[in-house]
């Protein structure tokens, strides 16, 4: 089976309780494989300061965020299989997992899957897009053996 090539960058001070490169690889493969094979991407795990800076610079939001996606747009004439970069903030992921009562690795997996789908062009700005993206995320997460990541939200709003 073809693999998504992951360039993993750990630039956070505390690397305890982070997913392994093999876990990130498996999650990214499952999210990306139906669309592409043999693509390369960067997953950069950062602290709040870097996430905050990037979120402010690129999204105008003055706070750290869980995952930022930077798709790579290659000119048509260039043959390059670079999908893009994910920047995931360790502290935000840990805090959200705790607040939402989710297992930490399940939330890490969700952030990788969510970010990969953004790199593939999915979005959640419009309701219809959000529904499609969340449905796909749920399907991928369940195929990886995790619960529906939106279950608690659906219970609260359903």
Swiss-Prot record:
Q: How is the cofactor bound?
A: Binds 1 zinc ion.
Q: Which SUPFAM superfamilies match?
A: Metalloproteases ('zincins'), catalytic domain (SSF55486)
Q: Which cofactor does it need?
A: Zn(2+)
The record's family statement is:
Belongs to the endoribonuclease YbeY family.
> What InterPro entries does its record include?
MetalPrtase_cat_dom_sf_prd, YbeY, YbeY_CS
Give the chief site where it resides.
Answer: cytoplasm
The identity of this protein, by name, is Endoribonuclease YbeY
Question: What does this chain do?
Answer: Single strand-specific metallo-endoribonuclease involved in late-stage 70S ribosome quality control and in maturation of the 3' terminus of the 16S rRNA.
| Residues binding Zn(2+) | 114, 118, 124
Gene3D superfamilies reported for this sequence: Metalloproteases ('zincins'), catalytic domain
Keywords recorded for this protein, A-Z: Cytoplasm, Endonuclease, Hydrolase, Metal-binding, Nuclease, Ribosome biogenesis, rRNA processing, Zinc
């Amino acid at each position: 089976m073809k693999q998504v090539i992951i360039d993993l960058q750990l630039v956070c001070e505390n690397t305890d309780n982070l997913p392994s490169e093999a876990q990130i690889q498996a999650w990214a493969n499952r999210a990306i494989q139906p669309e592409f094979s043999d693509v390369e991407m960067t997953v950069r795990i950062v602290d709040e300061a870097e996430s905050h800076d990037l979120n402010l610079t690129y999204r105008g939001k003055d706070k750290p965020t869980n995952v930022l996606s930077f798709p790579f747009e290659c000119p048509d004439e260039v043959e390059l299989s670079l999908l893009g970069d994910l920047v995931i903030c360790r502290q935000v992921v840990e805090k959200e997992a705790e607040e939402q009562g989710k297992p930490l690795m399940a939330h890490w997996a969700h952030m990788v899957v969510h970010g990969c789908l953004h790199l593939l062009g999915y979005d959640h700005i419009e309701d219809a897009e959000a529904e499609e993206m969340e449905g796909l995320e749920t399907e991928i997460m369940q195929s990886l053996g995790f619960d529906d990541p939106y279950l608690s939200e659906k219970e609260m709003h359903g």
